Amino acid sequence: MPIKIPDQLPATEVLREENIFFMQESRATTQAIRPLKVIILNLMPKKIETETQFLRLLSNSPLQVDVELLRIDNRTSKNTPTEHLDTFYRQFEGIKDRNFDGLIITGAPLGLVQFEDVIYWDHLQTIMTWAKDHVTSSLYVCWAAQAGLKLLYDLPKRTRKEKLSGVYKHTNLDQHHPILRGFDDQFLAPHSRYADFSADYLKSHTDLDILATSKEAGVYLAATKDKRNVFVTGHPEYDSFTLHNEYVRDLGEGMEPTIPVNYYPDDNPDITPKATWRSHGHLLFSNWLNYCVYQQTPYDLEHFSEQNFTRDE
């Protein structure tokens, strides 16, 4: 949370240059606090596992967050009981007239499927378009990042020859960007995807701020200038065994997956893996909630509009 300082304090410029989060007194007196309303569109097959992973990260914040779960309308799930979906998940028709502070769209195992061949592609586009006028900040994760780039920038699907799987080192490219506050100069995060996110390609075809990259994995973190759209190409929400379970699954299906990079001790799948990205995941989601959502969203969501957004001091 920010420190509150007098409006004309000489230290203001120094604090701003050092990326210290502060709020001037005139703004602090007008900032009211209420629970943030965040909705998660869960596209993953194992919905209970995925919702647990994201809720874990959203919980590590001093802000109160009211979370709702969203499903693709009338889609049955092979891996999640119908009664769970009916009890805990909303359908788009039921929420389309409401506004939210944040939207998270999860990944989906559709790396080798063309967008137009995704059964729910039209419905997903409808939700992403709706978010422009109903959500303060949207967070697109892994496959959803690729889908979001297609919708917002009409970028074609770019696919790697081999699946990227493992835990990779990333470089913090802008220590003064709010999303990266508190990040180490280099940090680890897991990836599990076929999508290719080249930094040069995104720089030449979008106006995104490229915030973190990896030599092996390409762009990991990017955002629009107004922070209303944030793209995470990896899986910071994964728990310790998610990559292992995917590896075992692929082996069981007769595939020949490579051992996830930098994941198992001594690259030995028989040794219990360790999560080396947990603190990064918590900090990323905490920063998104604070700087992209809470600091920008209007207090009264019923009067949501572009003009309502507050800006960094």
From Swiss-Prot:
Q: Which residues of this UniProt protein bind substrate?
A: 163, 192, 249
> At which residues is there a site annotated Important for substrate specificity?
192
InterPro entries in alphabetical order: Class_I_gatase-like, HST_MetA, MetA_family
The site annotation (Important for acyl-CoA specificity) covers 111
| Compartments where found | Cytoplasm
Principal location listed in the UniProt entry: cytoplasm
Tell me the active site. Answer: 142, 235, 237
Keywords, A to Z, come to: Acyltransferase, Amino-acid biosynthesis, Cytoplasm, Methionine biosynthesis, Transferase
Q: Pathway of this protein?
A: Amino-acid biosynthesis; L-methionine biosynthesis via de novo pathway; O-succinyl-L-homoserine from L-homoserine: step 1/1
Q: Which reaction does it catalyse?
A: L-homoserine + succinyl-CoA = O-succinyl-L-homoserine + CoA
EC numbers: 2.3.1.46
The UniProt GO MF terms for this protein read:
homoserine O-acetyltransferase activity; homoserine O-succinyltransferase activity
Q: List the record's Gene Ontology CC terms alphabetically.
A: cytoplasm
Gene Ontology biological process terms in this record: L-methionine biosynthetic process from homoserine via O-succinyl-L-homoserine and cystathionine
Q: What class of enzyme is it?
A: transferase
- Family membership, please give it: Belongs to the MetA family.
The role this protein plays is: Transfers a succinyl group from succinyl-CoA to L-homoserine, forming succinyl-L-homoserine.
Record-linked NCBIfam families:
metA
Name the HAMAP family for this protein. Answer: MetA_acyltransf
Protein name in the entry:
Homoserine O-succinyltransferase
Query: Source species, please?
Result: Aliivibrio fischeri (strain MJ11) (Vibrio fischeri)
* Taxon lineage: Bacteria, Pseudomonadati, Pseudomonadota, Gammaproteobacteria, Vibrionales
